[in-house]
Regions:
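Divalent metal-cofactor coordination and adjacent catalytic microenvironments
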Residues: 1-98
């Protein structure tokens, strides 16, 4: 499991969500999920993409968000049903608390 957000790959996510065989389409989708997760973290916390690596627990958030989107077959994060672990971690590091 990658310790920095920038180190997370589609293979890491595939292993985390226990995909046995990963097609080219799956890899593309997983890369999209990683990008969506990073953007969500940036928007939620107010941190830049470069700053995400300063917080190792953001890597956990990426894994959880990707798994949630994969399981639900969506390409967006559902704010109304946000995982409590994700919400707690992001809340601890938010700089845009308006």
């Amino acid at each position: 499991m990658a310790q920095k957000v920038s180190d997370i790959t589609a293979t890491d996510i595939a292993n985390y969500i226990r995909l046995d065989e990963v097609s080219e389409d799956d890899t593309k989708t997983l890369n999209d999920l990683i990008a969506i997760s990073k953007a969500f973290i940036e928007n939620y916390t107010g941190h830049t993409e470069k700053e995400l690596d300063d917080y190792p627990d953001f890597a956990i958030v990426v894994y959880i968000l990707c798994q949630d989107m994969w399981d639900n077959g969506t390409l967006y994060v559902d704010n109304s049903n946000l995982n409590k672990v994700v919400e707690t971690i992001l809340g601890m590091h938010s700089v845009n608390l308006l």
